[in-house]
Amino acid sequence: MELKALDIINKFEALNKLADKETDLSTAIIIAKNLKELSTYKEIITKKRDIIIIKYAERNDDDVVVRDENGNVKITDVDGFNKDISEILDTIIEVNLLLLPKDKMMDMKISAKDILPLTDILDGEL
């Protein structure tokens, strides 16, 4: 399955929330395998994002990254930063994800926001 990097991040976060829910063994294994498959790509995406943040970070006279009052890194060239981040998040990556058995997850409590990134890997009618 081909996914954009942004979709990998969203699926990883949604699966991570599912991983805390109680389910049958086979579904738990599928969730765990999918998390493992996505985690490597998520780490690579995060490292590339961090490199871009450092590239565009504002620095003081001592070459220390400047942060705002909330602890966020101040960016010097917002347009360049957004362009580079968008390029990373739009990158297409081939991943091998297993389908989640919808019928085994019917008793799970999950928000629409959390299930949305997973709808294309649900096995069964919606």
Residue ranges of each PLM-predicted region?
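N-terminal interaction modules that seed assembly of large macromolecular complexes
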Residues: 2-57
